[in-house]
């Protein structure tokens, strides 16, 4: 059957117009779906980050890893740049509590002392024989022992980690335990000074759990707890500026110290006298908080800073 030549074209135009409308609607639905999915994942990620930090803030410090290398920037002590960028992208401000209260190594050297283990043994033994100190109530790993030597008794402090029940024993047992630690008899006041050169089996670094060797360099904190210099430096510059044993917070001493050291450069941290007999003096440009921090160190460690290391 032949098609008439004069057939109207309005039917084909209506079909073409309807097809174009369906294509536009389909494209609009796809665009809106993509936008909705993006907003959904954005909100989901933001909620996940929020609840993650909320749950982590509720956990104690003891449940966290000992030293976290991947979350902390060694130079600034803040969270890694990737985490900061993630917080900026998600529009979520990471709580300041999660930013580690750490310090720089230069600032740590201002309030603590480095001493070889063999010298620390000598100073501890001499302090146990002649001087008197008092126990800091904030430390749970210390015990006071009253030991008589001649007519004048002396009060000495020992640090016990492996045997926490040492303070509940009798006076004889405590004196015997102290004698074993110092490798000498408690009633012998004329023992040779060479006895302190024997390594103490109870002396070990609480961070790495390795025994101290004679050539090891220890860092003594103002709370009189000692650790390997490398271990405690890593702890306080990457994890938390507090003593791993007594949990005494030293970050408050470094809040203004870091600001002063940034103005006067690295030499500002070393312009403070490290001991009462040191010839180096405190520069006028350094903040007063440095002197207060040093006075805290000297008052908390009198028997160590009393002589040149």
From Swiss-Prot:
Q: Which GO terms describe its cellular component?
A: cytoplasm; endoplasmic reticulum membrane
PROSITE patterns attached to this UniProt entry? ZF_RING_2
Specify whether Zinc-finger is a keyword of the entry: yes
Q: Which Pfam families match?
A: zf-RING_2
> Can you say where in the cell this protein is located?
Membrane
Repeat as a keyword?
Answer: no
| GO biological process annotation, one example | ubiquitin-dependent protein catabolic process
Residue ranges covered by zinc fingers (RING-type) = 205-247
An example of a GO molecular function for this protein is: ubiquitin protein ligase activity
| Record keywords, A-Z | Meiosis, Membrane, Metal-binding, Transmembrane, Transmembrane helix, Zinc, Zinc-finger
The membrane-topology field of this record reads: Single-pass membrane protein
Residue stretches spanning the membrane: 23-43
Q: Its function?
A: Has a role in meiosis.
Q: What is this protein called?
A: RING finger protein mug145
Source species? Schizosaccharomyces pombe (strain 972 / ATCC 24843)
């Amino acid at each position: 059957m032949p098609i008439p030549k004069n057939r109207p074209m309005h039917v084909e135009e209506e079909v073409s117009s309807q097809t174009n409308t369906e294509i536009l609607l389909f494209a609009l639905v796809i665009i809106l779906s993509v936008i909705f999915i993006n907003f959904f994942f954005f909100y989901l990620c933001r909620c996940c980050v929020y609840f993650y930090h909320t749950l982590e803030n509720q956990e104690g410090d003891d449940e966290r890893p000992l030293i976290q290398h991947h979350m902390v920037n060694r130079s600034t002590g803040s969270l890694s740049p990737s985490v900061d960028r993630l917080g900026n992208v998600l529009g979520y401000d990471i709580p300041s509590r999660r930013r580690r209260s750490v310090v720089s190594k230069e600032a740590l050297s201002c309030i603590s002392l480095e001493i070889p283990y063999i010298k620390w043994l000598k100073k501890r033994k001499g302090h146990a024989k002649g001087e008197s100190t008092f126990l800091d109530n904030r430390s749970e790993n210390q015990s006071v022992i009253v030991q008589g030597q001649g007519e004048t008794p002396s009060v000495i402090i020992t640090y016990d980690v492996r045997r926490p029940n040492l303070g509940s024993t009798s006076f004889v047992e405590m004196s015997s335990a102290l004698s074993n630690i110092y490798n000498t008899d408690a009633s012998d006041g004329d023992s040779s000074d060479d006895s302190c050169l024997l390594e103490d089996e109870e002396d070990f670094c609480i961070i790495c759990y390795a025994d101290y060797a004679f050539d090891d360099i220890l860092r003594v904190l103002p709370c009189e707890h000692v650790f390997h210099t490398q271990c405690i430096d890593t702890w306080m510059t990457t994890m938390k500026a507090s003593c791993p044993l007594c949990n005494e917070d030293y970050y408050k001493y470094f809040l203004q110290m870091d600001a002063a050291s940034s103005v006067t450069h690295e030499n500002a941290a070393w312009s403070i006298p490290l001991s009462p007999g040191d010839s180096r003096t405190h520069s006028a440009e350094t903040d007063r908080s440095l002197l207060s921090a040093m006075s805290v160190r000297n008052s908390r460690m009198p028997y160590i800073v009393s002589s040149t290391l």
